[in-house]
Amino acid sequence: MSNELRIFPPEVHSPHKTTLKAVLSTAAGREFHQYMDIESTGNVDIDKDDLADAWCIFFIHKMMETGGEFSVTGPGRLSRSLLVNLDRYAEAWNRWMPNVFHRVTIHAAERDDSAVPQRDEAISCFSGGLDACFTAYRHRKGLAGPQTLNLTACVMFQGADIAENNQEHFDKAFSKARELLEDIGICQFYRIRTNFRNMGMDYEMTYHTMLMGGMRVFTSRFGYFMAGSEGSYDSFSYPWASNPCLLYTSDAA
């Protein structure tokens, strides 16, 4: 038995709701089943070609726990530049935590970056917290100078700060966050429910790949993906999930 990331076709429930599923199988016989339930105030519209990018980022730390070669099967083609960046990402984590994370080689159907639609719109994670509000406001009001992005949508993860099964708490937080976003002109708001934490990894070391993997299902709709930073260039620590040294390797196509 070899290491395999198997991606399943999207389950489209309505124009506003889609479920994505994938399973990571290791040569040792372990399996990690993951899902993303995606709902939106508008249409979801998932492009199957984007699924390989999304799930490879989503599972990269679990792959590194095993190490070795992984084949990716099912719908989706992995962006060439992302494949290179994930190799850099794995190399860095292997240097920082060699007893936990190992180098990996990913074999997948590839697509040249020129095949990925070039969009100027951005999507950002939005929890309703101070860092998320600052990021959204800063870009919507054009306060980031040359780095200002055309932020048109946000996404909130159920299974991150709020537990996957705490529906009542999440619904209240989502409703409040939606009001905040509408006040600054953002009407496209996604919710992604996921069982990422069930993989049993150190969340503080791995959560950023959940956020980026979740947003990368929209590669064909948005050209930029944002999340509030845990630290600045002059005050950050590593190893840590979100740090300026490695953000480009998972954020950029």
Regions found by a protein language model. Name each.
Residues 184, 190-225:
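Loop-centered beta-sheet repeat module
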Residues 243-247:
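Acidic, Ser/Thr-rich peripheral helices and adjacent loops at domain boundaries
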Residues 51, 55, 131, 207-211:
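Catalytic-loop motifs flanking and including active-site residues across diverse enzymes
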Residues 248-253:
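Conserved small/polar residues in nucleotide/adenosyl-binding loops
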Residues 123-135, 139:
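Glycine-rich active-site/cofactor-binding loop and its immediate structural neighborhood
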Residues 1-121, 138-193:
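RNA-binding accessory domains that recognize and position tRNA/RNA substrates
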Residues 80-86, 134-137, 165-166, 201-203, ...:
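A short acidic (Asp/Glu
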